[in-house]
């Protein structure tokens, strides 16, 4: 696990999730799907009140690099027993720089 921060912008404003996390395996399709798992995390913003959401823009901060998030649909789910949260972003518009940390 490493430091990971995702900032998402939608009609409710800016929301973030940050903490220890890592990318999860995702299908190799285009535009890409980004999947992440967080432990020891903190959320801010109204987006986390809904399990499904639309994103206008955003960014991923991982490993000292930043990656833009384009228009996308997202979901999140929380596992209270395991104390982690999973976030999936299904990009609608291809980004200029693809986050290629999925493994």
Curated annotation (Swiss-Prot):
Keyword field: Cell adhesion, Glycoprotein
Protein's name in the database: Glycoprotein 24B
One GO-annotated biological process of the protein: cell-cell adhesion
Family per similarity comment: Belongs to the csb family.
InterPro entries: Dicty_CAD (IPR008601)
Pfam families xref list: Dicty_CAD
Function of the molecule: Cell-cell adhesion during early development.
């Amino acid at each position: 696990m490493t430091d990971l921060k995702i900032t998402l912008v939608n009609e409710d404003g800016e929301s973030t999730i940050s903490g220890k996390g890592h990318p999860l395996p995702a299908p190799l399709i285009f535009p890409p799907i980004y999947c992440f798992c967080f432990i020891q995390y903190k959320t801010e913003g109204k987006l986390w009140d809904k399990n499904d959401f639309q994103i206008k823009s955003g960014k991923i901060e991982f490993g000292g690099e930043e990656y833009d998030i384009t228009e996308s649909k997202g979901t999140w789910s929380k596992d209270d027993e395991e104390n982690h949260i999973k976030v999936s972003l299904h990009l609608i518009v291809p980004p200029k720089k693809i986050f290629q940390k999925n493994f």
